[in-house]
Protein backbone atom coordinates (compact mmCIF):
# COMPACT_ATOMS: atom_id res chain seq x y z
CA UNK A 1 0.00 0.00 0.00
CA UNK A 2 2.64 2.51 1.10
CA UNK A 3 4.93 3.10 -1.84
CA UNK A 4 2.78 1.23 -4.36
CA UNK A 5 -0.65 2.90 -4.20
CA UNK A 6 -0.06 5.64 -1.64
CA UNK A 7 2.58 8.33 -1.89
CA UNK A 8 3.24 8.05 1.83
CA UNK A 9 6.87 7.08 2.32
CA UNK A 10 7.69 10.70 3.12
CA UNK A 11 5.45 10.39 6.19
CA UNK A 12 7.44 7.45 7.55
CA UNK A 13 10.79 9.07 6.81
CA UNK A 14 9.71 12.14 8.77
CA UNK A 15 8.37 10.00 11.62
CA UNK A 16 11.73 8.23 11.82
CA UNK A 17 13.55 11.57 12.00
CA UNK A 18 11.20 13.09 14.59
CA UNK A 19 10.86 9.95 16.71
CA UNK A 20 14.60 9.32 16.96
CA UNK A 21 15.42 13.03 17.36
CA UNK A 22 13.17 13.16 20.46
CA UNK A 23 15.42 10.47 21.91
CA UNK A 24 18.70 12.08 20.90
CA UNK A 25 19.48 9.93 17.85
CA UNK A 26 19.91 10.53 14.15
CA UNK A 27 18.40 8.10 11.63
CA UNK A 28 21.10 5.65 10.50
CA UNK A 29 21.39 5.27 6.73
CA UNK A 30 20.24 1.63 6.81
CA UNK A 31 17.36 2.07 9.28
CA UNK A 32 14.47 2.47 6.83
CA UNK A 33 15.71 -0.44 4.72
CA UNK A 34 15.92 -2.63 7.82
CA UNK A 35 12.46 -1.91 9.22
CA UNK A 36 10.44 -1.62 5.99
CA UNK A 37 9.76 -5.36 5.51
CA UNK A 38 9.00 -5.82 9.21
CA UNK A 39 5.57 -5.46 10.71
CA UNK A 40 5.00 -2.72 13.28
CA UNK A 41 5.69 -4.94 16.28
CA UNK A 42 8.95 -6.36 14.94
CA UNK A 43 10.04 -2.87 13.81
CA UNK A 44 9.36 -1.58 17.33
CA UNK A 45 11.35 -4.44 18.87
CA UNK A 46 14.20 -3.79 16.45
CA UNK A 47 14.17 -0.05 17.22
CA UNK A 48 14.21 -0.68 20.98
CA UNK A 49 17.09 -3.12 20.63
CA UNK A 50 19.12 -1.05 18.17
CA UNK A 51 18.91 2.20 20.13
CA UNK A 52 18.82 0.71 23.64
CA UNK A 53 15.44 2.25 24.44
CA UNK A 54 13.73 1.49 27.72
CA UNK A 55 10.25 1.41 26.15
CA UNK A 56 7.67 -1.18 25.19
CA UNK A 57 6.92 -2.06 21.55
CA UNK A 58 3.26 -1.17 22.09
CA UNK A 59 4.22 2.35 23.20
CA UNK A 60 6.36 2.92 20.12
CA UNK A 61 3.58 1.68 17.85
CA UNK A 62 1.07 3.98 19.52
CA UNK A 63 3.41 6.95 19.14
CA UNK A 64 4.10 6.14 15.48
CA UNK A 65 0.37 5.83 14.76
CA UNK A 66 -0.33 9.14 16.44
CA UNK A 67 2.37 10.83 14.37
CA UNK A 68 1.03 9.33 11.12
CA UNK A 69 -2.73 9.67 11.63
CA UNK A 70 -3.13 13.31 10.62
CA UNK A 71 -0.89 12.99 7.57
CA UNK A 72 -2.84 9.98 6.28
CA UNK A 73 -6.20 11.57 6.97
CA UNK A 74 -5.39 14.93 5.38
CA UNK A 75 -2.21 14.90 3.28
CA UNK A 76 -1.28 11.51 1.81
CA UNK A 77 -2.31 11.16 -1.82
CA UNK A 78 -2.53 8.26 -4.24
CA UNK A 79 0.33 7.57 -6.61
CA UNK A 80 -0.16 8.84 -10.14
CA UNK A 81 -2.84 6.84 -12.03
CA UNK A 82 -3.54 4.56 -9.05
CA UNK A 83 -7.18 5.65 -8.78
CA UNK A 84 -7.88 5.10 -12.47
CA UNK A 85 -6.23 1.68 -12.36
CA UNK A 86 -8.12 0.53 -9.26
CA UNK A 87 -11.44 1.72 -10.68
CA UNK A 88 -10.73 -0.06 -13.97
CA UNK A 89 -9.89 -3.31 -12.16
CA UNK A 90 -13.01 -3.06 -10.04
CA UNK A 91 -15.21 -2.36 -13.06
CA UNK A 92 -13.76 -5.49 -14.71
CA UNK A 93 -14.81 -7.56 -11.68
CA UNK A 94 -11.33 -8.09 -10.29
CA UNK A 95 -11.21 -8.84 -6.58
CA UNK A 96 -8.67 -6.67 -4.81
CA UNK A 97 -6.99 -7.14 -1.44
CA UNK A 98 -4.45 -4.93 0.27
CA UNK A 99 -1.62 -6.70 2.08
CA UNK A 100 0.02 -3.92 4.03
CA UNK A 101 2.32 -3.11 6.91
CA UNK A 102 0.19 -0.06 7.72
CA UNK A 103 -2.68 -0.15 10.18
CA UNK A 104 -6.15 -0.19 8.66
CA UNK A 105 -7.06 2.76 10.90
CA UNK A 106 -4.40 4.82 9.11
CA UNK A 107 -5.04 3.85 5.52
CA UNK A 108 -8.85 3.67 5.48
CA UNK A 109 -9.44 7.43 5.93
CA UNK A 110 -6.84 8.13 3.24
CA UNK A 111 -8.37 5.67 0.78
CA UNK A 112 -11.85 7.00 1.49
CA UNK A 113 -10.77 10.62 1.01
CA UNK A 114 -9.15 9.62 -2.28
CA UNK A 115 -12.27 7.77 -3.47
CA UNK A 116 -10.95 4.20 -3.64
CA UNK A 117 -11.79 2.53 -0.32
CA UNK A 118 -14.71 0.65 -1.87
CA UNK A 119 -12.44 -0.83 -4.55
CA UNK A 120 -11.01 -3.23 -1.96
CA UNK A 121 -12.63 -6.53 -1.07
CA UNK A 122 -10.21 -7.31 1.76
CA UNK A 123 -7.47 -5.80 3.88
CA UNK A 124 -4.74 -7.70 5.71
CA UNK A 125 -2.12 -6.01 7.84
CA UNK A 126 1.12 -7.51 9.02
CA UNK A 127 -0.20 -7.04 12.56
CA UNK A 128 -2.75 -9.79 11.84
CA UNK A 129 -0.23 -12.44 10.80
CA UNK A 130 2.82 -13.97 12.50
CA UNK A 131 5.50 -12.32 10.32
CA UNK A 132 6.18 -9.18 8.31
CA UNK A 133 6.51 -8.93 4.56
CA UNK A 134 9.78 -10.84 4.51
CA UNK A 135 7.57 -13.95 4.92
CA UNK A 136 4.54 -14.85 2.75
CA UNK A 137 1.99 -14.82 5.61
CA UNK A 138 0.31 -11.50 4.74
CA UNK A 139 0.00 -12.42 1.05
CA UNK A 140 -1.37 -15.89 1.82
CA UNK A 141 -3.96 -14.40 4.16
CA UNK A 142 -4.99 -11.86 1.50
CA UNK A 143 -5.52 -14.66 -1.04
CA UNK A 144 -7.48 -16.65 1.54
CA UNK A 145 -9.79 -13.71 2.23
CA UNK A 146 -10.40 -13.36 -1.50
CA UNK A 147 -11.05 -17.12 -1.68
CA UNK A 148 -8.30 -17.49 -4.27
CA UNK A 149 -5.17 -19.60 -4.52
CA UNK A 150 -1.80 -17.86 -4.74
CA UNK A 151 -1.56 -18.93 -8.39
CA UNK A 152 -4.74 -16.94 -9.12
CA UNK A 153 -3.35 -13.76 -7.59
CA UNK A 154 -1.04 -11.01 -8.75
CA UNK A 155 1.06 -9.21 -6.14
CA UNK A 156 2.16 -5.60 -6.55
CA UNK A 157 5.00 -4.94 -4.11
CA UNK A 158 7.79 -2.40 -3.83
CA UNK A 159 9.79 -4.24 -1.16
CA UNK A 160 12.27 -6.74 -2.59
CA UNK A 161 11.95 -9.07 0.40
CA UNK A 162 8.18 -8.95 -0.06
CA UNK A 163 8.48 -9.87 -3.73
CA UNK A 164 10.69 -12.84 -2.81
CA UNK A 165 8.31 -13.93 -0.05
CA UNK A 166 5.26 -13.78 -2.32
CA UNK A 167 7.07 -15.64 -5.08
CA UNK A 168 8.16 -18.36 -2.65
CA UNK A 169 4.49 -19.01 -1.85
CA UNK A 170 3.47 -19.41 -5.49
CA UNK A 171 2.18 -15.93 -6.28
Predicted regions and their residues:
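Substrate-recognition "cap/lid" segment bordering the active-site pocket of phosphatases
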Residues: 75, 97, 103-154, 160-168
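Active-site neighborhood of HAD-like aspartate-dependent phosphohydrolases
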Residues: 1-33
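Metal-dependent phosphoesterase signature
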Residues: 26, 46-84, 92
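Short beta->alpha linker loops
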Residues: 35, 39, 64, 77-81, ...
